[in-house]
């Protein structure tokens, strides 16, 4: 009888451990599904859709606080909203939150530093878009250094390449250079 109890206890422990492993294995796919669901809101290119997406990404980040991907997407979408709507009332808070998120990501083990530098460069780029006359000279080097560092770490970082190109084109237009 004791052996049967022991056997049942071992089976119960094994099942609990397997369930725990199964739940942990499902977390990344569940997280990815939630992120994808949030990003699908961006099919409507409206400020409200963008803000709803960001709010959902914040909830996903709260569910998975040790994961980098929700933080990355939340910061990226906050910056995307801010560059498209530099004078919106939500922009300043979104930029502060994005900066805090980038700072957190920078300290996280396993964070892609190329992505962190890209986001930081994008943050400074948005600051320039907000007020080019004041922030252009202040943040120009920060933008360039962050994109260059991102591309030095990962030369295949498509977002860093695209943002750097857009920034250089915008600066040429702003200064009248060819």
Report each predicted region and the residues it spans.
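Bacterial Sec-dependent N-terminal signal peptides
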Residues: 1-31
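N-terminal leader/linker segments that initiate helical-solenoid repeat arrays
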Residues: 23-64, 68, 72-73
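Structural marker of alpha-solenoid helical repeat scaffolds
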Residues: 63, 108-109, 153
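Helix-turn-helix repeat elements of alpha-solenoid scaffolds
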Residues: 43-58, 90-101, 137-141
């Amino acid at each position: 009888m004791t052996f049967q109890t022991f056997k049942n206890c071992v089976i119960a422990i094994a099942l609990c451990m397997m369930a725990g492993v199964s739940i942990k294995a499902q977390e990344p796919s569940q997280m990815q599904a939630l992120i994808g669901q949030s990003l699908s809101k961006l099919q409507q290119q409206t400020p409200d859709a963008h803000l709803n997406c960001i709010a959902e990404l914040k909830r996903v980040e709260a569910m998975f606080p040790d994961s980098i991907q929700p933080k990355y997407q939340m910061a990226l979408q906050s910056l995307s909203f801010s560059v498209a709507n530099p004078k919106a009332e939500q922009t300043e808070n979104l930029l502060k939150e994005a900066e805090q998120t980038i700072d957190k990501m920078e300290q996280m083990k396993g964070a892609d530093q190329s992505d962190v530098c890209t986001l930081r460069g994008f943050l400074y780029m948005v600051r320039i878009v907000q007020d080019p006359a004041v922030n252009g000279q202040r943040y120009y080097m920060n933008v360039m250094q962050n994109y260059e560092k991102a591309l030095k770490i990962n030369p295949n970082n498509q977002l860093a390449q695209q943002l750097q190109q857009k920034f250089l084109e915008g600066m040429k237009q702003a200064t009248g250079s060819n």
